[in-house]
A protein has these predicted regions:
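C-terminal interaction segment
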Residues: 2-21, 25, 42, 58-71, ...
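A structured, charge-rich N-terminal accessory region that forms the first stable segment of a protein
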Residues: 25, 30-40
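Hydrophobic, helix-prone linear segments
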Residues: 35, 47-49, 72-75
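A short acidic/basic microdomain associated with nuclease active sites
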Residues: 46-58
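Short hydrophobic alpha-helical runs that function as membrane-insertion/retention elements
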Residues: 127-131
């Protein structure tokens, strides 16, 4: 007697690339997200082993697509710099983010300070920063946490002479600064704020126009600007 075995096809596990929700709640959040990802990509452009991403799903348990988190911005060291539709830790030698930043809003505040914080600690995210571009839902407006023995502790805040708030990121080697309520990344090695390509072009144009006005003023005074 021959025993037949019924073949039951195995349905492949799907790991969605999106959840249908908008990337950002409003213009402030969107502009902030674009600024952060852009300047960090520029800053690490010569590092093929540093991956910067924004609003990308991170799946951290193979076979369990519900084990997922989507940071607004994250940076991973020690992985290939390439485009991804999602980030699956088991495909990246179990590398998890070293740095995460959440752009906090009314809808995300409780999750950013609760469930996500726990997940990031579980994943070993060394630094976790939060920023509220409106200043309405997070006080102080810019906050940082650093992981020490599986627990997060606040990153010390420095207030500069001009009132600028500064928090150092050991992971990035940069400072996160709050200038008039606006988040900027600052490189102390070059003493410069990180700018997008568009901001650099605008700053260069403004400097050129200022120089032209000054030269014109000197000529009015019968002074050759080229002689100075």
């Amino acid at each position: 007697m021959t025993t037949s075995v019924e073949y039951i096809p195995v349905t492949p596990i799907e790991y969605p690339d999106e959840d249908g929700k908008p990337m950002a709640e409003g213009d402030l959040q969107r502009k902030c997200l674009v600024y952060i990802t852009t300047v960090l990509e520029i800053y690490f452009q010569k590092r093929p082993d540093v991956y910067v991403a924004g609003n990308l799903f991170i799946y951290y348990e193979k076979g369990y697509p519900e084990s997922v988190v989507a940071p607004d911005v994250f940076v991973v060291f020690g992985v290939e710099k390439r485009d991804r539709r999602s980030y699956k830790t088991w495909e990246e030698n179990d590398k998890t983010p070293n740095f995460v930043l959440e752009i906090t809003s009314k809808a995300t505040r409780s999750k950013d300070q609760g469930a996500k914080k726990g997940i990031y600690a579980f994943l070993g995210v060394r630094e976790y920063f939060q920023y509220d571009p409106t200043g309405d839902y997070l006080n102080p407006q810019l906050q940082g946490l650093r992981l020490v023995e599986n627990n997060y502790f606040p990153v010390a805040t420095n207030t500069l002479a001009d009132g600028t708030v500064s928090l150092p990121s050991e992971v990035l080697g940069l400072e996160l600064r709050l200038e008039a309520g606006k988040l900027r990344f600052y490189d102390s090695a070059t003493d410069k704020t990180l700018l997008t390509h568009e901001e650099e072009a605008n700053a260069r144009k403004a400097a050129e126009e200022k120089a032209q006005r000054l030269a014109a003023k000197l000529r009015e005074l019968n002074i050759d600007p080229d002689s100075l």
